[in-house]
Amino acid sequence: MGKEAQLVLLLALPIAALRMNIDVAAVRAAAAPFSCAILRRGDKYLAEVRGADAQAAAGRLTCYGGKRERGESSLECLVRELNEELGWAPEHIPAEPACSLLVDGYLIAHFYEASVDRADFATEGRAFEFVDEGDARWSAWHARVLAARGAVAVFDDGGDPAATLELLRKVPTAGEDGLERRYYEPL
């Protein structure tokens, strides 16, 4: 199998050892509607503790990041979001994502991994913690991404692909070329 395709193991699915081919190069080259950071300090990860009233992942842990604006690259989005949410961004963020998240075949986010050497963030009243990768409070999507670093995280739980597409159509980058491309058909 060439560099253009990589065999990806779907994690935590009820069907044991389900495998599929995904064009990882195409996924990585595509503009994702969200950019997120996997920020680590030693063996701990910086996580946003989402409030009980949060619209997404209420009461769960998530990586920091957010929606990409039109005309922004994924890295520009990430730096902007980290500065907005933490008052800080790492000096060095690799150009290549550590992981990309596909949900129901659609690209949702690129996740970039970087180190953090501080804990004095300006979080606008939001809580944060340094936690283990295996912390049970991680949101389902973020737990999947942490487990799949270096590959593509696929999240198919038998949900409605139309709902995922509807989510994509609500972000600022809606309508951009390729945003509604499916990288595989859920089984």
Predicted regions and their residues:
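The catalytic Nudix box helix
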Residues: 64-98
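Short histidine/acidic/glycine/proline-rich micro-motifs that form metal-
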Residues: 67-69, 102, 137
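N-terminal strand-loop-strand
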Residues: 21-62, 90
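N-terminal chloroplast transit peptides
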Residues: 9-12, 16-19
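Classical eukaryotic N-terminal signal peptides for Sec-dependent ER targeting/secretion
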Residues: 1-8
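Charged phosphate-binding loop/patch that engages nucleotide di/tri-phosphates or the phosphate backbone
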Residues: 143-187
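Active-site-adjacent beta-strand/loop module that shapes the phosphate/pyrophosphate-binding cleft
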Residues: 32, 41-43, 99-134, 144-151, ...
